[in-house]
């Protein structure tokens, strides 16, 4: 049996552009894609912290160092410049491998600079 697990995430990215008249996708700074391990055209989930919207699209590579997070096409209705979002990619692994797997976690500041990276999400009590 294959289990679907969090492969990686960009945590609290700031949307820099929202382009409705675009073919689709989410353009992400190439350095951020590399840090997280997200490939161009890979399916991603975006969770908008500002409004609770959750949607699926695919990643495209923006210029490295640009700090761009551009939500494009129909998804532009779900995110505005300045919104903080969590961008996740998932993968499937056999149960035996899943038990040993750790995701790549990339934490960003409000300017889409990497603050820290990790592989475990700490438990947060309410």
From Swiss-Prot:
It comes from Thioalkalivibrio sulfidiphilus (strain HL-EbGR7). One of its GO terms (molecular function) is aspartate 1-decarboxylase activity. Catalyzes the pyruvoyl-dependent decarboxylation of aspartate to produce beta-alanine. NCBIfam families: panD (TIGR00223). The active site is at residues 25, 58. Heterooctamer of four alpha and four beta subunits. The modification Pyruvic acid (Ser) is found at residue 25. Gene3D superfamilies: 2.40.40.20. Its EC number is 4.1.1.11. GO terms for biological process: alanine biosynthetic process; pantothenate biosynthetic process. Its main location: cytoplasm. Belongs to the PanD family. It catalyses: L-aspartate + H(+) = beta-alanine + CO2. It is found in: Cytoplasm. Pathway: Cofactor biosynthesis; (R)-pantothenate biosynthesis; beta-alanine from L-aspartate: step 1/1. Keywords: Autocatalytic cleavage, Cytoplasm, Decarboxylase, Lyase, Pantothenate biosynthesis, Pyruvate, Schiff base, Zymogen. Substrate binds at residues 57, 73-75. GO terms for cellular component: cytosol. Pfam families: Asp_decarbox. This is Aspartate 1-decarboxylase. Is synthesized initially as an inactive proenzyme, which is activated by self-cleavage at a specific serine bond to produce a beta-subunit with a hydroxyl group at its C-terminus and an alpha-subunit with a pyruvoyl group at its N-terminus. Its cofactor is pyruvate. Binds 1 pyruvoyl group covalently per subunit.
């Amino acid at each position: 049996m294959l289990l679907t697990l969090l492969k990686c995430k960009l945590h609290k990215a700031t949307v820099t552009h929202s382009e409705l008249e675009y073919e689709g996708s989410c353009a992400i700074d190439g350095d951020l894609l590399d840090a997280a391990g997200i490939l161009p055209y890979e399916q991603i989930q975006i969770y908008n912290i500002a409004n609770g919207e959750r949607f699926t699209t695919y990643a495209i590579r923006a210029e490295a160092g640009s700090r761009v997070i551009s939500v494009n096409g129909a998804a532009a209705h779900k995110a505005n410049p300045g919104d903080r979002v969590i961008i996740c990619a998932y993968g499937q692994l056999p149960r035996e491998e899943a038990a040993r797997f750790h995701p790549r976690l990339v934490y960003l500041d409000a300017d889409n600079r990497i603050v820290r990276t990790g592989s475990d999400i700490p438990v947060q009590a309410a």
